Regions:
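Active-site helix of classical SDR
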Residues: 123, 161, 169
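Residue(s) in the substrate-gating loop at a strand-loop-helix junction
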Residues: 143
Length: 253
């Protein structure tokens, strides 16, 4: 079950964080990969690690997902290497954020471009490739903050971008429903990555989690990977437009 052998997955934001984690997870189920990010040296490291461990093919592609020209070049490279695309995992994201009273135009524009507009541009480009085979799985990484606000953090642009990801997912799912392509979103809560671990392991965060997360802890890597693997699989063929919170219950209270 959930075997991805023979599938080709494109993963953005693969140089670090959740993108890097998700690339490993899909490779572990047998998928060949095109891994996209701006830092190509980090992609080369991941390529060698994954190919050695899982025996799948990995194509590193330097790509700024906010730039249409970079994305078009990435599509050409992926089609040349693999001839098809089955799975698109939009993980790329970053934030230059502040509270609404202090945010600059540049902070807003950067966050929306990286976290939301990139999903539109990547999906437009790669869904056209998927349509050629009448098959595709698009998975967008949103956030629990795309579903709820959080007065404790000055992250207005981040909330707006991830809320946009939630609803663009639904719109894409409806539009492509008869094309063999599904589109779903995952809304992670607090998860440990190489970037978040220093914060999540602090006593302050542990106290915060006990107050705000019903399970009173942050998530583990495998708990998030499982959702992505399912949505990428053949078994998820009747699942589209779904918004899957994996957040320890944060959004249910």
């Amino acid at each position: 079950m959930f075997n991805l052998k023979g599938r080709v997955a494109v993963v953005t934001g693969a140089s670090s964080g959740l993108g890097r984690q998700m690339a490993r997870a899909l490779a572990g189920q047998g998928a060949d990969l095109a891994i996209l990010a701006r830092r190509v040296e980090r992609l080369e490291e991941l390529k060698h690690e994954i190919e050695k461990k899982y025996g799948v093919k990995v194509l590193p592609v330097q790509c700024d997902v906010t730039k249409t020209t970079d994305i078009d070049a990435a599509v050409a490279q992926v089609k040349t290497e693999f001839r098809k695309v089955d799975i698109l995992l939009n993980c790329a994201g970053s934030s230059k954020d502040a509270g609404i009273l202090d945010m600059t135009d540049d902070q807003w524009d950067f966050t929306i471009a990286t976290d939301l507009t990139s999903v539109f541009k990547m999906t437009r480009a790669f869904a056209n490739v998927m349509k050629e085979n009448h098959y595709g799985r698009i998975i967008n990484i949103a956030s629990m903050y795309g579903l709820v606000g959080n007065t404790a953090m000055g992250t207005v642009a981040y909330h707006a971008s991830k809320g946009g990801v939630v609803n663009i997912t639904r719109a894409i799912a409806a539009e492509l429903a008869t094309s063999g392509i599904t589109c779903n979103a995952i809304c992670p809560g607090y998860f440990e990555t190489e970037l978040t671990k220093p914060v999540l392991d602090t006593a302050e965060f542990q106290a915060f989690a006990k107050q705000t997360v019903p399970m009173q802890r942050y998530g583990q890597e495998g708990e998030l990977n499982a959702g992505a693997i399912f949505l990428a699989s053949d078994e998820a063929s009747y699942v589209t437009g779904a918004i899957l919170p994996i957040d320890g219950g944060y959004t249910c209270i």
